Amino acid sequence: LWLKERATPCPDAKHAGIAESLRGAWTTLKSLPQFPDFGILTTCGFLYQCGVAVVITLSAVYAAAVMGFTTEDTILMVFLVNITAAAGAFGFGYAQDRLGHKRALMVTLVVWLAMIVVAYFSETRTHFWIAANLAGLAMGSSQSAGRAMVGVFAPEGRQAEFYGLWNLALWLSAVVGPLSYGMITWVTGNDHRLAICATGLFFLLAIVVLVPLNVERGAARAKEMSAREAA
């Protein structure tokens, strides 16, 4: 309470930080052809995070509109999914060490796709509970696997740039995913089942995009560029 702040206020610091972040992201974006595997990963991350954003922001809406969940049901679902997400992140951490980054991410994307299928065909609350817990299992692990590979593909001294572009892609996905869901329900007259089915396309496309990614090649490219920039 008695500590005095001696720093001089800088009103433009926030705007300068945003501008600097955007410039860094643009610089990294222009250099993507030199890092093809990072480009693949960023595209994949954008796609699957579009789907994840839909699940995070609109799962309660789907549960109420399609499955007839009450507010109490939704609160319980969120609570249990958080527990499942913690267990999934812990378990997939070990799986990632054994399978490698790419395979671990591929497994989580398949789980996400399975969740969409179960949610789409759910006719009872039990089926939807299964879908919700599948989402929990995949949620933390898919995000951690992607971020781990960003660190592998980033040259020494440029980690902030690469993570900046990765975070920008995730920010865009948080807008595009829910917006696409909303547009589909609007066009189809509140057909939430069709909207959740369409959300599965994000995960399916992410799997297709991920297939040609080569972690070893991307890591070697990062080391090569680090050595070149240090010379």
Residue ranges and their predicted role:
Residues 87-101, 185:
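Helix-to-loop junctions at the C-terminal end of transmembrane segments
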Residues 120-132:
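Helix-loop junctions at membrane interfaces in 12-TM secondary transporters
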Residues 103-118:
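Structural signature of the two symmetry-related core transmembrane helices
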Residues 57-74:
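Short amphipathic helix-loop junctions that connect adjacent transmembrane helices
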Residues 5-42, 228-231:
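Juxtamembrane intracellular "pre-TM" segments in multi-pass secondary transporters
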Residues 1-3, 197-231:
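Multi-pass alpha-helical transporter architecture, strongest
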Residues 141-155:
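Intracellular juxtamembrane helix-capping segments at the cytosolic ends
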Residues 183-203:
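A membrane-interface helix-boundary motif in multi-pass transporters
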